[in-house]
């Protein structure tokens, strides 16, 4: 009967309808009647889909676990896995078996043709056996198959289904692989690693306060853009050995990021030059698109174990300010600027750490290797300014207008705001570096005297072996220089920097960038004017886990003809725990009257090669006027790459993010046992009316620097309530903390932080109503970042009771990322203290999953690789691009900007 719902009955009727369509299609010439042929082919395809769908259900019930595995479908694009896939495969198999070939796939068609014939033959056999079972063992409206297991026909059907299932699976893999590009096993594993990177990035973002757990639990669509952007940053500078390791061959990089390899390498080099604060600003910008502001103070948790999140083994920051005055003087008597009159080499060294740090630089000059090593111990008793001086090598250019290559000069140019080219500053290229002519014997004599006096002063020298080289095997951004070097021809031999091909765009290969731990010396010829320079460094060390060193260096060269000056500052990372500061002062006067003076400051580390490489890459920042410009450029590049993935690998990204959301969602809360009815003696305490609502600051509640708090009737309920849509808010703060605005008294919320004990002093000014124009109370509390509580209280008179009602206490115990985080969101309730009643935003509708909507919910068109799914933000339905082309703001959900909505919702929302 036609209304029989059993599997065998449904198969019987579907097979009869398919046979009728196939017979009609064979009864006429399709070329004579193309319209009729096209219509019948469409009906044939639909009939094949129905027959194979019912056959699959029968195989699931009869074969069970004996079905052929189809794990290879994980390599298929999502667009291929549709309900009509089986029908397309059957149609393709019949075409191949009939002698047709896939366009531009003749070779693959010839390989698949025997398998296609076997598939069609096996399918015909299965259809015949199933028709027999329909007539013999069908039970009307039965939910399961009731076949006689002792019947030979049943056993034959079972074996035929197994053969067909195996052949059809093999043909599916070959046919789909020939029609579309499928992932290889290696690519599939790479994308799994990228999925792991996404998950670790999300966990890190939740930990440092960039994202909130509520967004993950609610499957916030904005995370589909934020997570890939943050993953690019994390994969380049934090999880360096992960899938975004650009040092590995291009074949080992996923196809998702392989087209952007060169761009990613440049981005990696720039990201490594950022400080922890700047990196946090960039990540915050990638999440919120808010304005960049680097002028705010950071509140950092000293106990945070995320030092590897920005730059591994980096806890010190050296701020270097360099002032250079260069001149050329023909008068030898004026070149002496040091106070020391003797010709002896003097060293003043103080011990700051028990660890010794040795640096050397080697150089081949006329087949002779010259080296000078310095090993200083610095005292830990002196934290104030110390003179520092060390003589290593001085590279003087023939034209002083081109500048001198001296330590840290490339760093001084990183953040300079002038438009002057490098040659007009004080970085010289290899071709511009030249020395006066001098004999090798003279150089060796100077070096021997220097080394002898170094040994006499108790300073050790190290052999310049390759094993002790501070350069990395894979990344050598600098070339060390020997002390007081020269050649007979007056030329300096060039060493090419060993860098990746992609790094050559930064012009680092043509710049001789000096190690921060190296120093400068001078080499004069007998027939040229003597050149001297003097450096003075002042260091101040503040003892903290994230200590900041400041240094000022000045070099003066007296001249009648040339004079140049440059000033800049840079932040150079150093290593805590293994770092030691080296200060030395040396004056050298050879017997011939050549005079050279130099003082330098070096920040050395036990494992400084990696830090030096990171610092040298900072030369890429030289093309950016300000740090904001650098962060903006990085934002554009990172967002461009991440957003391009949304187009090129939309299905893969959706699958990855779905897995990430499932993994990182909060576990469901256990059901609480039913509470016992309260007895007369144990009456429930009446709740405080103010505890029924959680007030959040709105735009009118947050006091900005431009507002006048004199007649304001609003109050700030918590210092951590900051509206994210306030245009005055800027992206500032630190990992684990969110920004707290600082404005002028008496309405300021001031924060101070001390690393070490990590004590935060919070000053909150509360402005009360009732016509009072002055702040009632400012209370300071010292709290720990690990257990933060911000309390606003009032001890005034008239408004004491009112303000006590609005007393709120927010605690973030055990969560470093909770302190100061902005909790306001588009869906959070707003403060209702104004005279006008405010409506709380509604919760947005839950999106219908893609798998539950095979067709457009408006026009009922099936989705294809070209007809994509789109969700309406108002009703959550799934529509095609035509039916969801409208956009409108949805203020009831807190969405003030226009978002995608379907046509019906657009008419309804705009009409209302």
Swiss-Prot record:
Q: What are the binding positions for Zn(2+) 1 in this chain?
A: 856, 859, 880, 883
Question: What InterPro entries does the annotation carry?
Answer: FYVE_LST2, LST-2, Znf_FYVE, Znf_FYVE-rel, Znf_FYVE_PHD, Znf_RING/FYVE/PHD
In what ranges is there compositional bias, type Polar residues?
455-468, 545-556, 572-590, 705-717, 735-745, 780-801, 822-834
> What are the entry keywords?
Metal-binding, Zinc, Zinc-finger
The record's region (Disordered) falls at 323-360, 455-610, 664-745, 769-846
Under Gene3D superfamilies, the record lists:
Zinc/RING finger domain, C3HC4 (zinc finger) (3.30.40.10)
Residues that hold Zn(2+) 2 according to the record: 872, 875, 902, 905
Chain positions of all zinc fingers (FYVE-type): 850-910
Report which superkingdom the organism of origin falls in: Eukaryota
Q: Does the keyword Ion transport apply?
A: no
What spans are recorded as compositionally biased (Basic and acidic residues)? 333-355, 682-699
Record's compositionally biased regions (Low complexity): 323-332, 591-610
A GO molecular function term, named singly, is: zinc ion binding
Spell out the Pfam families in the cross-references: FYVE
Q: Name one GO cellular component term.
A: early endosome membrane
Q: Name the residue ranges with Acidic residues bias.
A: 486-505
Q: Where is the composition biased (Basic residues)?
A: 530-544
Q: Which family does it belong to?
A: Belongs to the lst-2 family.
Q: What does this protein do?
A: Negative regulator of epidermal growth factor receptor (EGFR) signaling.
Its name, as the record gives it, is: Lateral signaling target protein 2 homolog
The protein's organism comes out as Aedes aegypti (Yellowfever mosquito)
Upper lineage ranks? Eukaryota, Metazoa, Ecdysozoa, Arthropoda, Hexapoda
